[in-house]
């Protein structure tokens, strides 16, 4: 029973009374063991100054039997579901919204330093992210060209909507994979093993394994200035009951935070006042099966900088930032700080770089990379208009911070299976990582191992010495993380040999043995490296004498000239 002042209860019947009273708590009811976690039917009556609630537990109804259930259809969930289905398991992929499949709620880009290595490795194992990026890219650049080839990293700006459509269609057309729009509220277990999942509507699915890939949806809360509200990314519905259910199952949970910049309108940007950044003339695909001759850059990106006036406005409004007021409790990403954090942490810097990047070909939205913020919207507009080229900028979507629940990754084995519950796997931001590429890599590993577990086969565990994916998983499950984990080349002690250009040689045999890489594709890789071996032998037998022409060529490529023959 909840009591309210009489003046707040109208005399038009209990339905009007129910609508008029704003309750300081949620009507969502989490049932005990054996009952549904759902939004219950509620009977209301207004008597004197009280409203009474009678909770009626929702009954289950069975909706199907599957081998593997994947909860969440972001970058981790999509790769997990595709891998499990392609390995012969009847798989069901759950998402709160079909319109959010493989969504890019932050930067619409794929790759980057170390992240490009992950995408290449995903492709070599038979994953989908590299193919999708090649189809949907707007601009392609190879980063770190001034350094050695071990740290060359491919990065593309992607069309956000096209990427979503591509991945959604791939999932829809994959045999043995079904997609359901539903919120999973409960993981059912028996004798320490996963037996099923239940939706918020009471639909029960019998499964042998489940992959949790909830991203930032799990108890998500958005912050913009002093305003905060329950939400997933991009104002999507959050997932609330599942978090409590996982705690009841004994998983050790924690609270992390991330953020995203605002999106601005193209026509309000003065591109002539900015530094233009074009894509590479020679495009290198992410997927080893893509044809580079059919790939072309479509757009340019732009660079501009903050200044002292920008920093002054931010400093004067730090008291309105939930990051500094204590409103946000979650731990944020160390290597992707908000602009207000940069101003405080690097107070000696007179300016900070930002990149102005398109969101797609069918939209006027632009993304401001490097300007993540949780300051109020009016402050965001004020400091943006101090930046060269953004003096008349118009905000289409304000920047925000989002808090979410995730698991302590040391709760997981190297297969990404829970140490406490057999058949329960974690992937992506649920495991404490950040980034689309890190999520997709874990999703692939979790999906493979969920399928192998159902089939009674040994787990697939990748070694640090053979891949960045192995390094990523090993770091998470053995060292854990106190803030969202980001992959970097410096995290691998084998970085000199784990180049992105030899990912196929390193990992495609594993993908082929699993059944994710076709025989045709595998043979093509073997033929490629037979030619490489032949060329190495030819070069070893060839002597080159120093000459002005040869030395000029070597020096133009940053290599020392020859003094003697070789």
Descriptions of predicted regions:
Residues 15-24, 33-34, 38, 52, ...:
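Compositionally biased low-complexity segments, especially N-terminal hydrophobic helices
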Residues 62-76:
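Beta1/beta-strand and adjacent pyrophosphate-binding region of the FAD-binding site
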Residues 82-188, 201, 209, 213-230, ...:
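Conserved N-terminal/central alpha/beta ligand/cofactor-binding core
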Residues 244-254, 309-328, 357, 371-401, ...:
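Flavin-binding catalytic cores
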Residues 367-433, 461-474:
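A glycine-rich dinucleotide-binding beta-alpha-beta segment and adjacent secondary-structure elements
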Residues 439-460:
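Internal hydrophobic alpha-helix adjacent to the cofactor/substrate pocket in enzyme cavities
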Residues 491, 497, 508-513, 517-566:
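Extended, charge-enriched "interface" segments that sit outside catalytic cores
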């Amino acid at each position: 029973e909840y009591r309210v002042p009489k003046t707040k209860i109208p005399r038009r019947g209990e339905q009007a009374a129910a609508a008029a009273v704003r309750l300081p708590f949620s009507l969502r009811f989490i049932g005990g063991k054996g009952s549904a976690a759902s939004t219950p039917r509620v009977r209301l009556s207004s008597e004197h100054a009280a409203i009474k609630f009678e909770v009626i537990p929702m009954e289950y109804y069975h909706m199907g039997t599957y081998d593997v259930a994947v909860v969440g259809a972001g970058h981790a969930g999509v790769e997990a579901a595709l891998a499990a289905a392609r390995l012969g398991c009847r798989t069901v992929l759950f998402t709160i919204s079909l319109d959010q499949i493989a969504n890019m709620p932050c930067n619409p880009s794929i790759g980057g330093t170390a992240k490009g290595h992950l995408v290449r490795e995903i492709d070599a194992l038979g994953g989908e992210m590299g193919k999708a990026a090649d189809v949907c890219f707007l601009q392609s650049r190879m980063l770190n060209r001034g350094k050695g080839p071990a740290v060359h990293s491919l990065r593309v700006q992607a069309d956000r909507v096209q990427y979503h459509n591509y991945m959604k269609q791939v999932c829809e057309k994959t045999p043995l994979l079904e997609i359901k729009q539903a919120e999973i509220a409960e993981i059912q277990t028996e004798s320490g093993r996963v037996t099923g999942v239940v939706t918020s509507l009471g639909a029960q699915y019998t499964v042998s394994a489940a992959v949790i890939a909830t991203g930032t949806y799990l108890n998500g809360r958005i912050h913009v200035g002093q305003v905060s509200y329950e939400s997933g990314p991009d104002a999507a519905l959050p997932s609330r009951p599942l978090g409590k259910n996982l705690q009841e199952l004994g998983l050790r949970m924690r609270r992390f935070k991330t953020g995203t910049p605002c999106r601005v309108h193209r026509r309000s940007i003065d591109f002539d006042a900015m530094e233009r950044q074009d894509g590479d003339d020679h495009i290198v695909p992410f997927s080893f099966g893509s044809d580079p001759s059919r790939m072309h850059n479509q757009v340019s990106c732009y660079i501009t900088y903050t200044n002292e006036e920008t920093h002054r406005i931010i400093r004067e409004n730090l008291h309105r930032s939930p990051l500094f007021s204590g409103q946000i409790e979650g731990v944020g990403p160390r290597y992707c700080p908000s602009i207000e954090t940069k101003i405080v942490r690097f107070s000696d810097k007179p300016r900070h770089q930002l990149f102005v990047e398109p969101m797609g070909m069918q939209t006027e939205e632009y993304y401001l990379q490097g300007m993540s913020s949780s300051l109020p919207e009016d402050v965001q507009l004020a400091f943006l208009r101090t930046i060269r080229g953004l003096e008349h900028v118009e905000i289409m979507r304000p920047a925000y911070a989002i808090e979410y629940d995730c698991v302590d990754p040391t709760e997981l084995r190297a297969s990404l299976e829970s140490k406490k519950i057999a058949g329960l796997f974690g992937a992506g931001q649920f495991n404490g990582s950040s980034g689309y590429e890190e999520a997709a890599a874990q999703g692939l590993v979790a999906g493979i191992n969920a399928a192998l577990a159902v089939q009674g086969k040994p787990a697939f565990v990748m070694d640090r010495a053979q891949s960045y994916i192995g390094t990523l998983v090993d770091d998470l499950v053995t060292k854990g993380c106190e803030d969202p984990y980001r992959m970097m080349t410096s995290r691998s002690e084998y970085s000199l040999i784990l180049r992105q250009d030899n990912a196929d040689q390193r990992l495609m045999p594993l993908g082929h043995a699993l059944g994710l890489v076709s025989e045709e594709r595998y043979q093509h890789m073997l033929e490629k490296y037979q030619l490489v071996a032949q060329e190495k032998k030819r070069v070893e037998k060839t002597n080159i004498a120093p000459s002005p022409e040869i030395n000029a060529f070597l020096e133009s490529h940053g290599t020392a000239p020859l003094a003697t023959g070789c």
